[in-house]
UniProtKB/Swiss-Prot annotation:
<feature type="binding site">
    <location>
        <begin position="149"/>
        <end position="152"/>
    </location>
    <ligand>
        <name>AMP</name>
    </ligand>
</feature>
<keyword id="KW-0067">ATP-binding</keyword>
<keyword id="KW-0496">Mitochondrion</keyword>
<comment type="function">
    <text>Catalyzes the reversible transfer of the terminal phosphate group between ATP and AMP. Plays an important role in cellular energy homeostasis and in adenine nucleotide metabolism.</text>
</comment>
<feature type="transit peptide" description="Mitochondrion">
    <location>
        <begin position="1"/>
        <end position="30"/>
    </location>
</feature>
<dbReference type="GO" id="GO:0004017">
    <property type="term" value="F:adenylate kinase activity"/>
</dbReference>
<feature type="binding site">
    <location>
        <position position="156"/>
    </location>
    <ligand>
        <name>AMP</name>
    </ligand>
</feature>
<keyword id="KW-0547">Nucleotide-binding</keyword>
<feature type="binding site">
    <location>
        <position position="234"/>
    </location>
    <ligand>
        <name>ATP</name>
    </ligand>
</feature>
<dbReference type="InterPro" id="IPR027417">
    <property type="entry name" value="P-loop_NTPase"/>
</dbReference>
<keyword id="KW-0808">Transferase</keyword>
<feature type="binding site">
    <location>
        <position position="98"/>
    </location>
    <ligand>
        <name>AMP</name>
    </ligand>
</feature>
<protein>
    <recommendedName>
        <fullName>Probable adenylate kinase 7, mitochondrial</fullName>
        <ecNumber>2.7.4.3</ecNumber>
    </recommendedName>
</protein>
<dbReference type="GO" id="GO:0005739">
    <property type="term" value="C:mitochondrion"/>
</dbReference>
<dbReference type="GO" id="GO:0005524">
    <property type="term" value="F:ATP binding"/>
</dbReference>
<keyword id="KW-0418">Kinase</keyword>
<dbReference type="InterPro" id="IPR000850">
    <property type="entry name" value="Adenylat/UMP-CMP_kin"/>
</dbReference>
Amino acid sequence: MAWLSRVRGVSPVTRLAAIRRSFGSAAALEFDYDSDDEYLYGDDRRLAEPRLGLDGSGPDRGVQWVLMGAPGAWRHVFAERLSKLLEVPHISMGSLVRQELNPRSSLYKEIASAVNERKLVPKSVVFALLSKRLEEGYARGETGFILHGIPRTRFQAETLDQIAQIDLVVNLKCSEDHLVNRNETALPQQEFLGSMLHSPVAINARRESVGVYAQEVEEYYRKQRKLLDFHVGGATSADTWQGLLAALHLKQVNLTTSQKLTL
């Protein structure tokens, strides 16, 4: 697992400051909504200064992984489980945006307006949120993460590579039937977004939209040998979780009293 050992030499705070300046002057680009991530997304990029590679040979940093996949593939669930198991923070772009849906936030009006009008959150806003989150985490001593919600396009993936040292991208795949059933039966309604976002028509539209860009993102990471495809069947079942751990060459020692791993 040599891909767990790479690290950048430049301070992440320095890189994030540069990225924030460049995007502050850029035209506002937009991101789409995915019900699996609860809200709207954005973009981000690279951290650094690690903890410890899982193979024991890397510098002192945690893993920096991305979870991607079709809407309804339980990315949020698996990202949360992996973050606890690997003892790195789970960063969800959907959650970061949701936190700013507070009248006291300087970004509230811009985000609320986009949500209420079913428009996309500007890219400049998303990058600002992610940059802030990474800076705050680094200041607290965080050196790794499990990220989901981005990248959605090749451009976002390239941008992410300028901010964070992505070690691995887990691509969660599932059948068409599972996607529809999962969205129709398992997702709670979000009041401010309205039930129309969870209708079969909306679900299919999101899936088609995501699929167009997903292929280019998959190819981007596949060429870097960072992509791991994993088929989600029963989604949250114990067998699926154990299958994911096996695919990642991880083993959870004790599910009830320990978060230790073996390779």
